[in-house]
Regions:
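Long, well-ordered core segments of solenoidal/helical folds
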Residues: 20-44, 78-97, 131-149, 173-196, ...
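N-terminal signal-anchor module of multipass membrane proteins
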Residues: 2-73
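Hydrophobic, aromatic-lined core segments that form the binding pocket/scaffold
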Residues: 196-209, 220
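Conserved small/polar residues in nucleotide/adenosyl-binding loops
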Residues: 258
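Structural helix-adjacent loops and short alpha-helical linkers that scaffold large soluble proteins
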Residues: 11-15, 69-80, 120-138, 166-182, ...
């Protein structure tokens, strides 16, 4: 309870405070994370996929904080345990293997975090892996290239993986990147807004996915023409989206936010 109250009092107003919050989160997760495992359990809540996939999801979400921290050059006592988990999870000979993905698979969603890690860290990440382990990582992530998935913000997960491959000097598929962007351009509505797929509504995924991943791509890719478009769309979107939240943090309830 003390730790929870301490985190609630963290104003997150500086980089140091954000790092402190991340380390507190990683420390709390570590109590649920056995050594030499490729997943961990955070409870038995219901999802539309198996417990093994949910446990892989739990591990993967922590990487959205850990990989940027590692890219900054800061050390953390938790890095090695996560790197070991990735090696085990992507090794088809390991009992901890994350498995082959299927259509509309939640594991495809989680691959974006690994794409980010490769994009930010490049060979600083792959240096922790043997040649065989790098091949395993590439092969497991590469399942997303031709995967059957919703035509929606999910397209960005495939883009993030290819961006990671490219930045890390691994084989990548530029045609796959172009194809995914073309799909999303088909439901760009103007003024920075997309629908979350053909004929679907506008919702918080426009901010949390389309523009979030779009700005990562614009920053880390060498695709200057597309980066310019993505930045301009984000700028236009922000002029409207700012009114979805009040000064005290209250936001417009919409779709998943009301569940």
């Amino acid at each position: 309870m003390w730790a929870a109250n301490k985190e609630k009092s963290n104003p997150l107003s500086s980089r140091q405070e954000v790092v402190a919050s991340l380390n507190a989160l990683l420390q709390a997760l570590d109590t649920q994370f056995p050594a030499n495992r490729s997943r961990f359990s955070l409870g038995d809540t219901c999802a539309h996929y198996t417990a093994d996939i949910a446990q892989m999801e739990g591990l993967s979400r922590a990487l959205w904080g850990l990989f940027p921290l590692m890219a900054s050059g800061e050390s953390t006592p938790f890095s090695e345990k996560y790197l070991t988990a990735i090696k085990l999870g992507t090794d088809p000979q390991s009992t901890g293997y994350w498995g082959e993905t299927g259509p509309y698979d939640q594991r495809l969603v989680e691959m974006a975090a690994y794409g980010l890690g490769l994009a930010l860290l490049g060979d600083k990440l792959t240096a922790h892996f043997t040649g065989r382990e790098v091949m395993n990582l590439h092969a497991w992530l590469n399942q997303i290239t031709d995967a059957q998935m919703p035509d929606s913000n999910w397209n960005y997960f495939a883009i993030m993986v290819q961006l990671g491959f490219k930045r890390a000097g691994l084989p990548y598929d530029q045609a796959a990147i172009d194809h995914r962007f073309a799909l999303m351009d088909a439901y760009y509505l103007g003024d920075g807004w997309y629908s979350d797929g053909p004929g679907r509504p506008k919702d918080y995924y426009i901010s949390m996915a389309f523009h979030f991943y779009g700005l990562i791509y614009a920053t880390l890719s060498d695709d200057e023409a597309r980066a310019k478009v993505l930045r301009e769309r984000s700028r236009l979107f922000a002029e409207d989206f700012i009114y979805w939240s009040a000064a005290d943090g209250a936001s417009v309830p919409d779709r998943k936010s009301v569940v």
